[in-house]
Amino acid sequence: MKYEKLEPAAIDETVAGLVGWTLAADRLSISKSYKFRNFVEAFGFMTEAALTAEKLNHHPEWFNVYSRVDVKLTTHDANGLTDHDVKLAKAMEKAAARRAD
C-alpha cells in the first residue's frame, strides 16, 4: 500500500482538530497520553484501538502502565504523518470517550 505524507498545512490543520494530541518537533509524528480509571479500562481501550488498527492495517507505537496509555502515531513507510494516522487518532478518541468518567 502506498501512503501519501500529509502536506505541512494539512498537518497543522489536522493537529489543531485533534484535542490533546501533540505534534513532534520534527513534525513526523503525533502523540497523546490517555489516563483511565484503572487497568481494565486502559486495556479495553487498547483492545478496541487494536481492532481498528488491524482493520486499517496501521499500528500504533504505544506503552501502557496500569491506567495510562501513551500513544505515538506515524507512518514509517511514508516517513511522516498520513491520513492513516489521522483515522487511527480519531478512532482512539472515540474509544477513549466511551470510557470517560
Swiss-Prot record:
Record GO biological process: tetrahydrobiopterin biosynthetic process
Catalytic activity: (4aS,6R)-4a-hydroxy-L-erythro-5,6,7,8-tetrahydrobiopterin = (6R)-L-erythro-6,7-dihydrobiopterin + H2O
Domain of life: Bacteria
GO molecular function: 4-alpha-hydroxytetrahydrobiopterin dehydratase activity
Enzyme class, first EC level, given as a word: lyase
Pfam families for this protein: Pterin_4a
EC number, as in UniProt: 4.2.1.96
Keywords linked to the UniProt accession: Lyase
PANTHER family documented for this protein: PTERIN-4-ALPHA-CARBINOLAMINE DEHYDRATASE (PTHR12599:SF0)
Similarity comment: Belongs to the pterin-4-alpha-carbinolamine dehydratase family.
NCBIfam families according to UniProt: PRK00823.1-3
Name of the featured protein: Putative pterin-4-alpha-carbinolamine dehydratase
Biological source species: Rhizobium rhizogenes (strain K84 / ATCC BAA-868) (Agrobacterium radiobacter)
